[in-house]
């Protein structure tokens, strides 16, 4: 079975701009292509940031470009969130995604998209458990099962391993590859339209 590997980061605005596309690809191809999500660890460890006024200015410039290129909406609640000087740590939302890959793998793509929407449209803080519990409830995932794995040492270790694996494939987000019979083909680096992505996948299928 072909595999689509998606390297992203939950705090990457361009990845949010790409979220409708990855969800559409998943809905179309989930029965014939395996999807693997690899959060890349953009801001982790020593690179964890604070949502300072300088960072917010940087975000707003990029968000405008994302909206223009992708047509996605950034919510008013997100703009309110930008007024808070919260910590920006990619490890936490990445660990939430890794958790779902382990406890409900078939829901990883919808969960990942919902995590991005939680920040960029609904203005939710990705540092808080309640943000993920709300998504888990919406997707029918048992909340206690999620919490137990999410806070486990295994999840933390596996998230670090995922970062290391992601960097072998890409250093920029989003990047999309297709693996077919041991051969890897990059079909997206940055942003591509859904029609272009579908065409590239169809070529590789045939």
Identify the residue ranges that each predicted region occupies.
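Surface-exposed, flexible loop/turn segments at secondary-structure boundaries
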Residues: 12, 43, 184
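Structural alpha/beta surface segment adjacent to cysteine/selenocysteine redox centers
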Residues: 19-119
């Amino acid at each position: 079975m072909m595999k689509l590997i998606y390297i992203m980061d939950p705090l990457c605005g361009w990845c949010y701009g790409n979220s409708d596309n990855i969800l559409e690809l998943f809905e179309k191809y989930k029965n014939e292509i395996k999807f693997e999500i690899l959060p890349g660890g953009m801001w982790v460890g020593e690179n964890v940031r604070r949502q300072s006024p300088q960072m917010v200015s940087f975000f707003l410039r990029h968000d405008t470009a994302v909206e223009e290129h992708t047509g996605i909406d950034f919510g008013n609640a997100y703009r309110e969130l930008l007024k808070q000087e919260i910590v920006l740590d990619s490890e936490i939302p990445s660990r939430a995604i890794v958790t779902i890959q382990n406890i409900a793998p078939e829901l990883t793509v919808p969960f990942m998209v919902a995590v991005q929407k939680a920040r960029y449209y609904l203005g939710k803080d990705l540092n808080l458990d309640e943000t993920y519990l709300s998504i888990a409830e919406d997707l029918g995932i048992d909340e206690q099962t999620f919490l137990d794995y999410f806070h486990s040492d295994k999840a933390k270790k596996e998230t670090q391993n995922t970062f290391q694996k992601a960097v072998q494939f890409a250093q920029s987000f989003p990047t999309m590859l297709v693996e077919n019979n041991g051969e890897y083909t990059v079909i997206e680096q940055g942003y591509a339209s859904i029609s272009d992505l579908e065409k590239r996948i169809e070529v590789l299928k045939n």
